[in-house]
Amino acid sequence: MKCQMQVSKLLNVLAVSIGLTFVYSTSAFAVDADAALSMARQNGCLKCHAVDKHKDGPAYRDVAAKYKDKDHAETVKKLINHITSGEKAKFPDGHEEEHKIIKVKDVAQQTNLIEWVLSLPGGKWPETD
């Protein structure tokens, strides 16, 4: 009987732990689209990018399409590095320029921006990439 109570308590603790893990893991990827778009505007991202059309930089939907089948965590890490390090951006005509570094230093806000871009329904990525 005592063993049965211990097993029951253990199962209850396990169930609560699994439930909390699910809640935190799903809320961790909740995207604030308004905040992301506002941040993109404030940091001048929309001078070179648009949600659904190519400018000097690719459309955000096309970026989402490019990384759709890639490892998500690695993609987020790579794209955060891209917007915070000034690494070279390649243009369709072949020239390269340093990518503008965003002003926002809060990793959560940077991640929200990237998660928003990746959440957009895909466009297409040019075959030349």
Q: Where are the regions a protein language model picked out?
A:
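C-terminal segment of classical bacterial N-terminal signal peptides
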Residues: 13, 18-28
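Bacterial N-terminal signal peptides that target proteins for export
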Residues: 2-15
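Electrostatic cytochrome c docking/interface patches
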Residues: 26-40, 66-70
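The canonical Cys-X-X-Cys-His
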Residues: 42-52, 113
